């Protein structure tokens, strides 16, 4: 299992007279213990090998991504909006997205790069967004050069107007001037290929965004082959890190992109899509069968959910912080009232009424005993001889 981003495959070339010995190995970069999340992401994207970010859309999926071995997370706008039941058209407010990100960030130790759409407004919105992301320990943000409110790139992309290039450069500069952490990443996403403008416009904008301070360029394409990416990488000539999202051209081997010099690949929406398929199949089966027989063995156990939620840690914390049996605790149960329940309490106090074959008083005593409270005083009154 991959547990870190690949740094390089070529380790050494040894020259001996009449011989050339090349040593290959797979090396992975591990986050240094205590390294800031921003520094982790910056190191990941700047590494000489091909790195990967996996999509997550809530705290649970973020934890699953980290446990799988990924070194970074893509906070997908499409996936977060879908998980909230709305369209990927800025229908979820940026503060609602921040709420989701806060849970995601708390759940993991690896960095998150937010899909920040268009920055949720102009340069001023961008400044506030960066401040709020840094407060939540989010490692970076990617913004795309389209107009607010955005539309997903795979829905009628040719009809989506691009943002004014100079205005978008202003957003990038505002973000970089606002960040308080030097390692916070601002990624500029090119939509020129999506909108049908072609290579020249993509290169013109990429150069402008790079000069404005973008830490990396995300080159987006909806073709089913990699010709857009191939052409861009050839002309870009390693002027800065390039990130790609091969959702549509998934059949192209990742080794091809490593050879091109691509920095990072984002698997952009596959957790939400797999979750949707699994939920549809399970829900349909339960509805049709009116039974759980055919699904129970195919879904996660309740225990696995508890594990992912950190139930064991809570148990240990309870032992540490909750009162123990070593500390004497007294309890008084007031059982003197007859109550006003008619014939039910004509001869007995209401505390002796039974539920499921057990009196209310006995149930109370058992519950106190269960949490270690043994010193219990019962105050009697009506029909006290029966208690």
Regions found by a protein language model. Name each.
Residues 2-9:
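Extreme N-terminal basic, low-complexity initiation segments
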Residues 106-113, 233-291:
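Catalytic-face loop-and-helix region of soluble metabolic enzyme cores
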Residues 38-39, 51-53, 57-90, 94-110, ...:
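Alpha/beta enzyme core
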């Amino acid at each position: 299992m991959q547990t870190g981003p690949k740094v390089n495959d070529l380790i050494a070339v040894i020259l001996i007279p009449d011989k050339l010995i090349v040593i290959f190995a797979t090396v992975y970069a591990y986050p240094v213990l205590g390294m800031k999340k921003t520094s982790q992401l910056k190191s990941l994207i700047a590494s000489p090998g091909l790195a990967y970010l996996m999509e997550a859309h809530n705290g649970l999926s973020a934890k699953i991504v980290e446990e799988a071995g990924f070194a970074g997370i893509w906070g997908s706008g499409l996936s977060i909006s879908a998980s909230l039941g709305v369209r990927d058209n800025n229908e979820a407010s940026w503060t609602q997205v921040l709420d989701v990100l806060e849970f995601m960030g708390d759940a993991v130790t690896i960095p998150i790069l937010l899909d920040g759409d268009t920055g949720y407004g102009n340069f001023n919105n961008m400044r506030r967004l960066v401040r709020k992301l840094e407060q939540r320990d989010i490692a970076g943000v990617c913004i795309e050069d389209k107009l607010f409110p955005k539309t997903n790139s795979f829905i009628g992309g040719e009809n989506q107007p691009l943002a004014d290039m100079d205005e978008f450069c202003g957003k990038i500069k505002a973000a970089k001037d606002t960040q308080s952490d030097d390692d916070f990443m601002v990624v500029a996403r090119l939509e020129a290929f999506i909108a049908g403008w072609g290579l020249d416009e993509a290169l013109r904008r990429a150069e402008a965004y790079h000069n404005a301070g973008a830490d990396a360029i995300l080159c987006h394409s909806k073709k089913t082959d990699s010709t857009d990416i191939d052409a861009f990488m050839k002309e870009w000539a390693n002027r800065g890190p390039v990130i790609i999202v091969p959702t549509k051209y998934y059949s192209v081997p990742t080794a091809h992109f490593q050879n091109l010099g691509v920095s990072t690949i984002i698997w952009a929406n596959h957790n939400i899509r797999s979750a949707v398929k699994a939920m549809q199949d399970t829900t349909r089966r339960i509805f049709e069968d009116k039974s759980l027989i055919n699904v129970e063995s195919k879904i996660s156990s309740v225990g696995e959910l508890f594990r992912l939620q950190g139930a064991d840690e809570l148990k240990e914390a309870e032992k540490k912080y909750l009162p123990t049996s070593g500390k004497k605790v007294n309890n008084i149960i007031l059982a003197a009232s007859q109550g006003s329940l008619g014939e039910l309490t004509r001869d007995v106090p209401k505390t002796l009424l039974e539920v499921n074959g057990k009196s209310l008083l006995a149930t109370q005593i058992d519950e106190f005993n269960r949490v270690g409270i043994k010193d219990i005083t019962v105050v009697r009154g009506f029909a006290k001889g029966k208690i």
